[in-house]
């Protein structure tokens, strides 16, 4: 067991959302945890408050005494801490391998898929908590009810996201897995081959033991395509009545979704029950169905499922409502923040906003994430961005990439302008975006701040400007 051989664990890039969660759980398990990061953020401050040593910047001395070094995927091989660890024959492992080790301490439930992982993981943790199962969880966003993205529970289960972006989910050995959907994203990891992408998800499902169970969303075309090749036990879920778990009578009730769940899963009591999900969007109905499937498999009651969904307080940056902000013109606008950065998830979130606030003007502030994604999905981006009532685009968040010709926000603005419906506003510097939005917004608007990069700082800046009015 790792606990007999490893005492000191050092994280390089500990401030990342996936890294910080694992570090916190290991700390609470009794390991001595340290870490380093170039920049302080809310995650590093939280870890420091727990007594974890977090170093600013990277130097070789930081790995002194470490038994193992966990490196974020964003950390390069030339990092002085990685170099020093290798020179001293200290194992250097990716985040997913350490997550796999955590699954040796608990029964693992791994949530994979191109979109919806964070929400589905959070909903699963919420229901298992309501069922009294006290799960451990590691989530790619802050669970609002817990105030953190990770927690060590006393129960037998660990619920965690499984990251397909770098194929690291193939390190995991869960007893249950979920595939929310499969889309053509991070295709450089798979040699731009859909067949290799499909095979990776099949291999992920097959990481389960023979007694495991997968929950697969048949509303996803790519998931349907892999079903004939899946040899481990699985159940399907979706909006079609051929699925083992499906939903009908879906209704928007303000910012909630009310629907009927039908269960025709082998080995389970057949029947139906009503639930209210405390978040908007048909895509979140699918995410809830996945969580319901897992919950039923571990023995949670219908009452616990209903309680966990109705009492769900959301997760950071997933349709996160900040409330009304004051505007210079004397009115107010509702501020919502979201991590969406792929056209498919953006379309789902925008549809959720329309469903929740059908009478309001929808203003979108968007920062594209990566030039390559903008290039590869350029037409899809122009289509989805053209569905809002007003649009402010800030420049692409590079995420370490070099600029790509005709794949920036200016190019997107030009393409949308040609379609004739919108006159996009271009804001080159994201730091200028809050003030620009204050000038654009009208009384009664819903402003959706969206993107996976530095645009995450905009809500706090808008709230600060609102206080000054």
From Swiss-Prot:
One of its GO terms (cellular component) is cytoplasm. NCBIfam families: murC. GO terms for biological process: cell division; cell wall organization; peptidoglycan biosynthetic process; regulation of cell shape. The lineage of its organism: Bacteria, Pseudomonadati, Pseudomonadota, Betaproteobacteria, Neisseriales. Cell wall formation. Disulfide bonds: none annotated. Coiled coil: none annotated. InterPro entries: Mur-like_cat_sf, Mur_ligase_C, Mur_ligase_C_dom_sf, Mur_ligase_cen, Mur_ligase_N, MurCDEF_pg_biosynth, UDP-N-AcMur_Ala_ligase_MurC. This is UDP-N-acetylmuramate--L-alanine ligase. ATP binds at residues 113-119. Pathway: Cell wall biogenesis; peptidoglycan biosynthesis. It catalyses: UDP-N-acetyl-alpha-D-muramate + L-alanine + ATP = UDP-N-acetyl-alpha-D-muramoyl-L-alanine + ADP + phosphate + H(+). It is found in: Cytoplasm. One of its GO terms (molecular function) is UDP-N-acetylmuramate-L-alanine ligase activity. The keyword Zinc does not apply. Its EC number is 6.3.2.8. Belongs to the MurCDEF family. Keywords: ATP-binding, Cell cycle, Cell division, Cell shape, Cell wall biogenesis/degradation, Cytoplasm, Ligase, Nucleotide-binding, Peptidoglycan synthesis. It is an enzyme of class 6 (ligase).
């Amino acid at each position: 067991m790792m606990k007999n051989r490893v005492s000191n664990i050092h994280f390089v890039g500990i401030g990342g959302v996936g890294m910080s969660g694992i570090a916190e759980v290991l700390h609470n398990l009794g390991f001595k945890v340290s870490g380093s990061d170039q920049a302080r953020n809310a995650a590093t401050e939280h870890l420091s408050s727990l007594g974890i040593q977090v170093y600013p910047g990277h130097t070789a001395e930081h790995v002194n005494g470490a038994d193992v070094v966990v490196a974020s995927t964003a950390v390069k091989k030339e990092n002085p801490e990685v170099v020093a660890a290798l020179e001293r024959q200290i194992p250097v492992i990716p985040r997913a391998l350490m997550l796999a080790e955590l699954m040796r301490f608990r029964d693992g439930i791994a949530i994979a898929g191109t979109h919806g992982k964070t929400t589905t993981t959070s909903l699963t943790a919420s229901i298992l908590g309501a069922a009294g199962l006290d799960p451990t969880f590691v989530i790619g966003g802050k669970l609002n009810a817990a105030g953190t993205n990770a927690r060590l529970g006393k129960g037998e289960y660990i619920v965690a996201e499984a990251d397909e972006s770098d194929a690291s989910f193939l390190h995991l050995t869960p007893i249950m897995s979920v595939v929310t959907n499969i889309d053509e994203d991070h295709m450089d990891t798979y040699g731009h081959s859909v067949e290799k992408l499909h095979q990776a998800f099949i291999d992920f499902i097959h990481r389960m033991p023979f007694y495991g169970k997968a929950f697969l969303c048949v509303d996803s075309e790519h998931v349907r395509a892999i079903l004939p090749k899946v040899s481990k036990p699985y159940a399907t879920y979706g909006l079609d009545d051929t699925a083992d778990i499906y939903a009908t009578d879906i209704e928007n009730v303000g910012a909630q979704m009310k629907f009927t769940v039908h269960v025709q899963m082998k080995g389970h009591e057949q029947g139906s029950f009503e639930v209210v999900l405390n978040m908007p969007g048909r895509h979140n109905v699918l995410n809830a169905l996945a969580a319901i499937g897992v919950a039923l498999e571990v023995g949670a009651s219908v009452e616990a499922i209903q309680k966990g969904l109705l009492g769900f307080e959301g997760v950071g940056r997933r349709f996160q409502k900040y409330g009304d902000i004051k505007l210079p013109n004397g009115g107010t606008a509702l501020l919502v923040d979201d991590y969406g950065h792929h056209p498919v998830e953006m379309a789902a979130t925008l549809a959720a906003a329309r469903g929740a606030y059908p009478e309001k003007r929808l203003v979108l502030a968007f920062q594209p994430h990566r030039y390559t994604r903008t290039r590869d999905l350029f037409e899809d981006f122009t289509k989805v961005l053209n569905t809002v009532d007003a649009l402010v685009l800030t420049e692409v968040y590079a995420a370490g990439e070099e600029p790509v010709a005709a794949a920036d926000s200016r190019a997107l603005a030009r393409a949308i302008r040609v379609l004739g419906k919108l006159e996009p506003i271009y804001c080159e510097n994201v730091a200028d975006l809050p003030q620009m939005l204050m000038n654009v917004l009208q009384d009664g608007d819903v402003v959706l701040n969206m993107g996976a990069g530095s645009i995450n700082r905009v809500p706090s800046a808008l709230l600060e400007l609102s206080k000054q009015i």
